[in-house]
């Protein structure tokens, strides 16, 4: 079983709390809770499903994890449902923590609808990358593709809005490197989610900019 946890953070980030703009602080690990309903819902959902896993045993893994042979026979839902399963309590907590911190910030900037679009397309992008490039008979679970997508989106949005994104960039780099160094981590899902989230955020931002420009 391969899990794709996000389990590390930037140790320097806790020492500086100087505010920047739009609720983003130099300490990128303080969430903005002004408009994070979708983040709350997703966090509660991930925790609730893990409780169900604990109660039901391996039945959810067997039927909903990303397993390429099953996907290839038509069980396409696994590309999404795998992102709601976790291999351990630490796997879950790491992903929920990053979801809460990065997701709350991103959602407060782009809004609920765009945030949800970014989350689910990042999840799908990570799953597709894992499906296409991982060994054919391997299992993969975890929200990490979506989480990496949120981090990629935050980099794109932050740069567009001239925010301090240095600490998020460090977080992304650290976790990408860790994915290659440690065994049992689905780095393909990480990179797929990161690419998808960055691309979707760029498209959404530019679509909004073009719409506003045409209305002037």
Q: Where are the regions a protein language model picked out?
A:
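A detector for small-residue-rich transmembrane helices and their helix-helix packing motifs
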Residues: 2-216
């Amino acid at each position: 079983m391969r899990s794709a946890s996000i389990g590390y953070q930037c140790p320097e980030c806790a020492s500086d709390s100087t505010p920047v703009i739009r609720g983003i602080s130099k300490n990128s690990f303080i969430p903005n809770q002004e408009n994070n309903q979708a983040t709350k819902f997703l966090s509660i959902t991930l925790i609730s499903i893990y409780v169900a896993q604990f109660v039901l045993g391996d039945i959810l893994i067997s039927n909903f994890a990303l397993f390429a042979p099953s996907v290839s026979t038509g069980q396409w839902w696994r590309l999404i449902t795998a992102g709601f399963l976790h291999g351990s309590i630490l796997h879950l907590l790491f992903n929920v923590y990053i979801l809460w911190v990065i997701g709350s910030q991103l959602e407060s900037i782009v809004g609920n609808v765009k945030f949800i679009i970014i989350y689910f397309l990042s999840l799908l992008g990570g799953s597709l990358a894992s499906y296409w490039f991982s060994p054919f008979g391997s299992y993969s679970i975890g929200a990490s593709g979506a989480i990496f997508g949120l981090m990629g989106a935050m980099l794109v949005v932050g740069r567009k809005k001239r925010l301090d994104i240095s600490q998020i960039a460090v977080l992304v780099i650290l976790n990408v490197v860790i994915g290659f160094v440690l065994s049992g981590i689905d780095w393909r899902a990480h990179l797929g989610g990161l690419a998808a989230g960055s691309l979707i955020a760029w498209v959404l931002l530019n679509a909004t900019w073009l719409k506003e420009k045409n209305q002037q």
